[in-house]
Amino acid sequence: MNEQVEAFLRHLADERNLSANTIAAYRTDLEQFCEFLHGRRLFAWHDVTHDDVLAFLIDLRERRYASSTVARRVAAVKSFFTFLTGRGIVQRDPTERIDSPKVDRDLPRALTPRQVDELLELPLRSPTPERIRDKAMLELLYATGVRVSELVALNVNDVDLERNEVRCIGKNGRVRVLPINGSAATALEEYFDISRNQLARGSGSSTEALFLNHRGKRLTRQGFWLILKQYAEELGLSDLTPHVLRHSFAVHMLNAGFDLRAVQELLGHTSISTTQIYTHLNHESSHTPHAHPAPRASEVNGVRDEQALVPEEK
């Protein structure tokens, strides 16, 4: 069974050009499905029936997985069997009459402008090369709304401080050129002037990566999560994640009067409906409501609304 799973994952990478993170999620979902089938004494894909897939769905629900997780795993199984039937490995798709579960779409959490300012000021209370780097990362993350995977993938030549722009490669290789505000530009300048060379000494070879760990290697997503967790604990923000900063960027942009389409382009959303969920949020959704955005939040991108549309490079 594993052989077919590996063939499917190669298909996702080579023919559908999915990202490594998406493929890793498919792998996790299908490995859990395989484990479930083995528990039912099933070891060949052509032996899997509609009832087996339905039992897997019921098992996920009984184990109280989030509706979004259940929907994702069912979608992975359905895609996998579409692949198997298309290759003639199985004759009949057992997922044909399995409906994708409805997902309860929770409103994303966003920080207040005051909480954002407190977070962005925290690293330099005890400046070290690492914390100067952290300051630059947090400023850039909030100023652009990039995903954490996009942040850690940035290279030095993606940053243009003369134009105050950052070139970002998003999902499916889509490129966005994003304006950055003065706070982010200053933090990046200080990182380049003070910290990056010191961090790079930890490695025996040069690297084009923008953000480096203490060994001089490219910082990973997991590494950034651990850094953010440390600052979250210092501020008492137990549920702070990288995506909360992305949500905060979107909410504060919209609350400051930016056009929905402009924010969609900045975030790299392919569908406007994904961006529209942020219109249901305002600063009252946080514990410390504000009538107006704080100064840093109000200049989130350092540009006026009509300048915010970011053309996608072909």
From Swiss-Prot:
Q: Where in the cell is it found?
A: Cytoplasm
This protein's record includes keyword Ribosomal protein: no
- The Basic and acidic residues compositionally biased stretches are 302-314
Q: Which UniProt keywords apply?
A: Cell cycle, Cell division, Chromosome partition, Cytoplasm, DNA integration, DNA recombination, DNA-binding
User: Which BP terms from GO are recorded?
Assistant: cell division; chromosome segregation; DNA transposition
Domain (Core-binding (CB)) ranges: 1-85
UniProt entry tagged with the keyword Metal-binding: no
Catalytic-site annotation from UniProt: R147, K171, H243, R246, H269, Y278
Q: Which domain of life is it from?
A: Bacteria
Known PANTHER family for this protein? PHAGE INTEGRASE-RELATED (PTHR30349), TYROSINE RECOMBINASE XERC (PTHR30349:SF81)
- This protein is called Tyrosine recombinase XerC
Q: What is the lineage of its organism?
A: Bacteria, Bacillati, Chloroflexota, Chloroflexia, Chloroflexales
- Gene name per UniProt: xerC
